[in-house]
Design a protein with these regions (language model features):
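Active-site neighborhood of glycoside hydrolase catalytic domains
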Residues: 1-89, 96-104
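Short proline/glycine- and polar residue-rich coil/turn motifs
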Residues: 406-412
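Beta-sandwich strand segments
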Residues: 188, 293-295, 442-448
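Beta-sheet entry/capping signal
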Residues: 22-25, 75-77, 90-92, 109-112, ...
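Short, compositionally stereotyped local motifs that mark structural "simplifiers"
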Residues: 198, 202, 208-354, 373
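Flexible, acidic glycine-rich loops studded with aromatic residues
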Residues: 76-91, 97-248
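Aromatic, loop-rich ligand-recognition surfaces of beta-strand-rich domains
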Residues: 338-401, 412-461
Length: 461
């Protein structure tokens, strides 16, 4: 409707009186097109303006808003979705869905502000042992410092259009200012140094040394900053010959001592090398700075026939949720905290998760359990279905019949059991395809966009 533009212009007129800035950010993101396809007036507008599809309708809309604001002496900024259907002539693009939108805009000689979710969304977790509820993701300070806002795909002239980068922090999970501070500091210092320093002057080693001094300044300012960088960190690694897993502990602090304790042994031992784990157990790690206990971590391992075995992914997970690669799905650690500990998930945007697991030898298999997550408000939907094939030689795979039992427990933990109908089934190799939900339908959170598929662990029993 033409009246829609009149309403927007009235609103923008008031915005302009409040904000005398050169730039006005108009958004333009996450707009599903389904309703436009059903709207007779939208379809008529497309015919009148000779627009071939709804993407061009969005571009028409953005360009009209831009023309109005340009006439007021202002310039627009929009999220990278404004590229769809054709970019408005004078628009500046904020590239948040990765860097590709920024690359495309710069190649069209448009100014760009890089703000990809990975690594400059500061509402994401900054520790694998995050004790604070977050929206998900994992952007530790070292990843922030390593960020280079000018992509290598751009030549010298195109690179001039990269104005810089911006950190974003959405506040759905931040109810009070001290939590905002916790997520902001010290990552904002890392990004500031990245953006203010010549590339050749950056030194991660030197920055780490200066963190201690920075923390003293934060203390004086009474800022509730995060010390996650110095926390005791855990990682799970494959063992030699795929026999069990290894539990690794580390901290960035040069002084102090790391110790650990296995659940079947009350003795606390000094940590020297990764701990070999070959059965279901609970391990604890301790970091002592002198005699003071600074940090404690706990890891629970659920062993089954797939734990620690060789696994391959047909297609890698999204770079926003890569976990530790395919091994994440057989590391024996099941996420019981939900999206807040998203590093334990592999996330697939619109794609299926297809894996092949080598159990090492031919063995009985009675069921396969796929652990995942459903969080529709975050566009994470249950899988459409799961396919299972088995093989003794790794080359010739056969379908296998099974019953399915699905339940949601705890923090939206999706547990799907594939119960084999033939109780005498034996195999060495399993090929498991977890089908993505697909395009999110109208009326659902994220309608019109690709659904996320989150997979945590695959059990074979």
């Amino acid at each position: 409707k033409e009246n829609t533009f009149k309403v927007l212009q009235d609103v923008l007129d008031e915005v302009l009186t409040l904000f005398p800035s050169r730039y006005i950010h108009i958004g333009g993101d996450e707009c599903p097109k389904e309703n436009w396809k059903r709207c007779a007036q939208c379809q008529q507008r497309m015919k009148d303006e000779h627009l071939k599809d709804e993407h061009e309708l969005q571009s028409y809309f953005i360009q009209r808003v831009e023309k109005y604001l340009n006439g007021k002496g202002r310039r627009i900024i929009g999220w990278d979705e404004i590229l769809e259907g054709g970019l408005a002539p004078n628009a500046t693009v904020m590239s948040w869905r990765g860097e590709q939108g920024g690359i495309d805009a710069a190649k069209q000689n448009h100014d760009v502000i890089m703000t990809p979710g990975n690594p400059v969304y500061f509402d994401h977790s900054q520790s694998t042992n995050e004790d604070s509820v977050t929206i998900g993701g994992y952007n530790p300070i070292e990843k922030v410092y390593a960020y280079e806002p000018i992509p290598k795909e751009l030549n010298e002239d195109q690179a001039k259009h990269i104005l810089g980068a911006q950190a974003n922090m959405w506040a759905e999970y931040m109810a009070y200012p001290s939590k905002v501070e916790y997520h902001l500091f010290p990552r904002i210092a890392a990004l500031s140094e990245v953006l203010w320093s010549p590339k050749e002057s950056k030194s991660w080693e030197n920055f780490q040394i200066r963190l201690n001094t920075l923390f003293k300044r934060y203390d004086l300012m009474k800022i509730n900053y995060s010390k996650a960088y110095f926390d005791l960190k855990t990682s799970v690694l494959p063992s030699a010959n795929y026999n069990g897993v290894q539990w690794k502990l580390e901290t960035k602090l040069k002084s102090g001592m790391i110790k650990y304790q296995a659940d079947d042994n009350k003795k606390i031992s000094t940590y020297l090398l990764p701990v070999k784990v070959n059965k279901s157990s609970v391990l604890k790690g301790f970091f002592y700075n002198g005699t003071k206990l600074e940090s404690v971590v706990t890891e629970k391992f659920h062993f089954n026939k797939a734990t620690g075995k060789k696994i391959t992914l047909t297609k890698a997970a999204s770079p926003n949720y890569p976990g530790d690669g395919a091994f994440t799905l057989v590391n024996g650690v099941i996420n019981e905290k939900g999206l807040g500990k998203s590093r334990e998930f592999l996330g697939f945007s619109g794609d299926d998760c297809e894996v092949e697991i080598d159990l090492g030898n031919i063995t009985d298999v009675k069921n396969v359990i796929v652990h995942g997550l459903t969080e529709k408000g975050s566009w994470i939907y249950p899988h459409k279905n799961i396919e299972l094939k088995i093989s003794n030689d790794g080359e010739n795979f056969n379908d296998v019949s099974f019953d399915v039992a699905t339940e949601i427990v705890g923090n939206q933990h999706l547990r799907t059991s594939l119960i084999l109908k033939d109780e005498k089934t034996t195999t060495r190799y399993l090929k498991i395809t977890i089908r993505n939900y697909g395009t999110i339908p109208s009326g659902m959170a994220g309608a019109g966009h690709k659904a996320w598929l989150f997979v945590d662990e695959i059990e074979v029993n």
